[in-house]
């Protein structure tokens, strides 16, 4: 599940087997979620659209299907940098 169309049920099964929750987030263009920190690891995967993740001052634009781990306690920001609505999966370690 590294590129192309995202099989959400398969991702959810995989994440749950690894101890993570799995939810779907929807962001309009230009939405910014700035400077968050969580007490647990978080996984993020773009379903469609274009987001930029900034984790501890390192920026990246993951492709749809690319999994990104945000370590517990890491400061992070999510931006919808595309011109359309972005959908992305997120999960927290349980």
Label the predicted regions.
Residues 57-72:
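Short acidic-glycine-tyrosine-enriched beta hairpin
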Residues 8, 21-38:
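Conserved short histidine dyad/triad with adjacent acidic residue
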Residues 27, 37-53:
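Short, conserved beta-strand element in jelly-roll/cupin
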Residues 72-94:
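Ligand-binding loop in jelly-roll beta-barrel domains
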Residues 43, 50-52, 59, 75, ...:
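Structural motif
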């Amino acid at each position: 599940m590294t590129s192309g169309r995202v099989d959400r049920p398969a991702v959810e099964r995989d994440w749950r087997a690894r101890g993570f929750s799995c939810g779907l987030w929807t962001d309009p263009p230009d939405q910014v979620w700035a400077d968050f920190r969580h007490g647990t690891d978080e996984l993020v995967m773009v379903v469609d659209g274009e987001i930029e993740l900034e984790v501890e001052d390192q920026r990246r634009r993951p492709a749809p299907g690319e999994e990104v781990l945000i370590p517990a306690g890491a400061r992070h920001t999510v931006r919808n940098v595309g011109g359309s609505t972005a959908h992305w999966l997120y999960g927290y370690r349980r």
